[in-house]
Amino acid sequence: MEIGKKYELNPHRIKSFIDISSSNANMVGIIQENGGWFEVKSILSLDGFDYVTEIICANGEIYNDDGMGDDYFELSEEEFYCFREYKEPTSEEDKVEDKVYDVTKIHCIVDENNVDEIIELLRKTFKA
């Protein structure tokens, strides 16, 4: 993750994220209740690992590692795989898709020369 970039939970990784730590369920709630994405405002590097220590949510709410209880927010580098970079919806189709979990949109051109590669790509994408 990088300061200034926006991220959202990867819908396929929410359960994995919650299973890592009991406090992660609260952080899922923070993200979902405050617009569905956040921008990284602060990262701390400690002992060779990066930690996101402050975010600003889509609705402007700020959370950090100084928060108490339900307001606490901190991500360790080992949890970054549960997130993906957020992209602003550019069309009505994207806006609808963003509200549906477990949907992955793939644009590809398939012909007789690459059909096996595309099938393998689809398998890898949906069996992650």
Swiss-Prot record:
Domain of life: Viruses
Protein name, entry field: Uncharacterized 14.8 kDa protein in frd-Gp32 intergenic region
The organism of origin for this protein: Enterobacteria phage LZ1
